[in-house]
Amino acid sequence: MYKRQVKDILIRYKNLKRIYGYKIDTYWSNISTAEAYYKTNMDFLKPEIRNYFFKQEPTIKTKIDDLPPAKYNPGAQVKNSLVASGCIINGTVENSVLFKDVFVGNNCVIKNSVILNNVYLGDNTHIENCIVESRDTIRANSYYCGDGEVKIVVEKNDRYIL
């Protein structure tokens, strides 16, 4: 679909505008949909992609927040995941990407998910195949699972009501 959209734009504007292209032989991803955003984040769990961007001099620059390193409390289990600074892990995290300042409660299970920044996951929560929106509070004993497609979780956030 994306290829068709690009062709449509090029054909429409080829006589009206100067159009230039740049050949990319390295990793590239179009993140115009939630599914593509999810897939791109999951790609960073593959060593060859992660190493391309972070092994030598990082090619991705981010804002520095001076947060402490991630904290893994007793009982925490993390497998094949990227965990950013400021995170506190008390449960199980597998094949997931956790952005900065994520709190994972006791007995939580996070699998194949992208958890954006400033998210609180209450005790006994199960999140699988999901993208959890920034600044969310997922209450204890919650269950979210994307079956066959990515599920986007947006909860009402009582922590930030003015």
Where in this protein do the model-derived segments appear?
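Left-handed beta-helix
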Residues: K3-L162
